[in-house]
Amino acid sequence: MKILPGLTSTESDRIPAFVEALRRSDVRAIALFPTVLDPAERNELYRDLAAIPGLTIPHVHLRTDCTPDEMRFVAEQFGTELFNIHPRKSRHPFGEVPSDYASRVYVENVEIAPEDDELAALAGICPDYSHLESARLMGSTEYAATVERQLGSYPIGCCHVAGIRAGEPNVWNGGPDHHNFRSLADFDYMARYVDVLPARWISLELENPLDEQLEAARYLERLLGDRRRWTGRRGLSA
């Protein structure tokens, strides 16, 4: 299992610095979250990323305006293997998934949980653990129970990991989940989910600079590795 730093574009003014740091580093695998970028802006970003020799993007979060041609492009240019989308009843549904990509597209839990039949029709679930943990802490018991059940029932191909900053409400729903972390302890909640992780990649959905994300990745590797050494069951940890 590899932890991928994320190029997350909610704060798009941070993108140039991230790309330059990536270019200067030996990191050659990232996840991409083009959250606020329109097609023209994404094309410009793709050109910048394509100029980095050997760069791969195993996991891409698809915006609602991503086309089949764009999916094919990133798969061919960057070796993208897995995609995620929002549920069809969410505020930003993706729409119809091209049939030739259905086995590579996973549905994320966002402000609502995915429906079982859409998980069954596509590749499975892309858990956003910070959304789930935020819902659990805020008392959204039905949502949390649904997603936790789905984690034990459907394939988990990719995921989102962000920070939980207790006592610091975010701007979108007042929860403690944030795309910026302030302390490595903001990831301690992930110990709860060690037995429901993807097999290959954990994607950091963070706005922090690359060097800070790499520090977070090392912390998570230790945290999750230590936790896995003494638990062998599939399911949520206590």
Over which residues does each language-model region extend?
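N-terminal pre-domain/capping segments
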Residues: 1-62, 234-238
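A short, acidic, flexible beta-alpha connecting loop/helix-capping segment that sits on the rim
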Residues: 36, 90, 203-213
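Short, acidic/polar
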Residues: 10-23, 42, 65-76, 115, ...
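Hydrophobic faces of well-ordered beta-strands that scaffold small-molecule active sites
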Residues: 1-9, 28-32, 56-62, 81-85, ...
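A structural motif corresponding to the C-terminal end of an alpha-helix
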Residues: 25, 52, 77-78, 101, ...
